[in-house]
Amino acid sequence: MRLLGLDVGSRTVGVAVSDPMGWTAQGVEIIRINEDEKEFGLARLGEIIKEKQAKGVVVGLPKNMNNSEGPRAEAARQYAQMVEDQFNLPTDFQDERLTTVQAERMLVEEADVSRKKRKQVIDKIAAEFILQNYLDANGPLTK
């Protein structure tokens, strides 16, 4: 069963997909959004869900280091609810603390990617880390 992983920001949503067995995650794309204008990229997300035949969605939950939740965590929860309502898919959350830092470090240290190119792919890679961490901890989404 394929799952999507989402890294929800205020301007972009990074998207990753699992393999059919639910073992590995791979980055797909970055969807541009505009929270102020209530444009959440759901049409494009729906196309990806259909194309990849996703059966569930894992949304990164940006917790603070003390495990509390701030405004971005609330925005991620609201986005997950919109996805669940619009596409009738189960959603779950994965702590995304340090995934962007991890993605940035990988791009700099291992791939030697320029700053400009990093900005173009960082959210997609963060979504990949979110989904992979979820798969490693929980296996396929079954709720």
Swiss-Prot record:
Please give one Pfam family short name. RuvX
Q: Which HAMAP family match?
A: Nuclease_YqgF
EC number from the UniProt entry? 3.1.-.-
Tell me which family the UniProt entry assigns to this protein. Belongs to the YqgF nuclease family.
Entry GO MF terms: nuclease activity
Provide GO CC annotations from the record.
cytosol
- Nuclease in keyword set: yes
Ranges in coiled-coil conformation: none
On whether DNA repair is a keyword of this UniProt record, the answer is no
What is the annotated localization of this protein? Answer: Cytoplasm
Instruction: Tell me what this protein is called.
Output: Putative pre-16S rRNA nuclease
At the top of the EC hierarchy, this enzyme's class is: hydrolase
Query: What is this protein for, i.e. what is its function?
Result: Could be a nuclease involved in processing of the 5'-end of pre-16S rRNA.
- What NCBIfam families has UniProt attached to this entry? RNAse_H_YqgF (TIGR00250)
| GO term, biological process aspect, one | rRNA 5'-end processing
Instruction: Provide the alphabetized UniProt keywords.
Output: Cytoplasm, Hydrolase, Nuclease, Ribosome biogenesis
